[in-house]
A protein has these predicted regions:
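Class I SAM-dependent transferase core
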Residues: 1-70, 86, 100-117
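Flexible, active-site-adjacent loop/turn segments at secondary-structure boundaries
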Residues: 13, 37-38, 46-47, 76, ...
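Short, well-ordered helical secondary-structure segments
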Residues: 27-30, 41, 46, 79, ...
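Residue-level signal for pocket-adjacent positions within structured domains
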Residues: 34-35, 78, 188
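Conserved beta-strand/loop positions that form the S-adenosyl-L-methionine
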Residues: 72-74
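Conserved SAM-binding loop of SAM-dependent methyltransferases across substrates and taxa
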Residues: 76-89
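S-adenosylmethionine
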Residues: 90-216
Length: 216
């Protein structure tokens, strides 16, 4: 079993509530089959809770009730599966092009009994027209100049991109400003999430989008 500190447990209880056991089972999947099959590096196991699961799960506070969320480049389910566990009111579409990752994701979804998750084996740019999300999430996919073009077209006429980023978030916004505006972004900001829960809060780039017409 993956160790969890008292502080991590407190944060996990607040985020996952009565679904904490599901979160613990997910972490065990990450630590075992996830590492065996190359979705998570072995060195990450001791910090799965703090650096990965809680880091991702706290962004649930930025997503409105009942939203359809598309998670681009879902990989090991970060943040997609974290959100599906924390927020059963959300409808999650996990978009992942690599077959071995898709197989693993489906195994975890089936084992946890998550009925609010759909997995698509495809690239984000090929999912345009098949997904009309209210919110698109991403973590460690690419720089914002490229990520904007992968995420914004997946939104319905209006919506939000919630991308987990690092300390360079502000610089990325500056470089991507023109691309974001062209795609329909009307407001872009850096938001710090989880300050009261995590030792290292999560940095999020939030893009509010209102498109005049569907971008193909």
């Amino acid at each position: 079993m993956v160790d969890i500190t008292a502080a991590e447990l407190l944060a996990a209880e607040k985020i996952f509530g009565d679904r904490l056991d599901l979160a613990k089972r997910y972490v065990e999947h990450l630590a075992t089959s996830g590492t065996e099959r190359g979705l998570i590096g072995p060195r990450e196991v001791p910090r799965l809770w703090s650096r990965h699961v809680l880091n991702c799960a706290v962004i649930e506070s930025e997503i409105a009730h009942g939203s359809h969320v598309a998670d681009v480049g879902s990989g090991a389910g970060l943040p997609g599966l974290c959100l599906a566990i924390a927020r059963p009111d959300l409808e999650l579409t996990l978009i992942e092009p690599l077959e071995r990752r898709v197989i693993w994701l489906q195994e975890v979804v089936d084992d946890l009994g998550l009925t609010n998750v759909t997995i698509m084996r495809t690239r984000a740019e090929l999912a345009v027209g098949m997904v009309d999300a209210d919110v698109v999430t991403a973590r460690a996919v690419s720089a914002l100049t490229n990520l904007a073009g992968l995420t914004i077209p997946l939104l319905a006429g209006k919506g939000e991109v919630v991308a987990i980023k690092g300390r360079s978030a502000g610089e990325e916004i500056e470089k991507a400003a023109k691309v974001i505006r062209k795609l329909g972004g009307i407001q872009t900001s850096v938001v710090t999430v989880g300050e009261s829960l995590l030792e290292e809060p999560t940095t999020v780039v939030r893009i509010v989008v209102k498109k005049s017409q569907k971008i193909a």
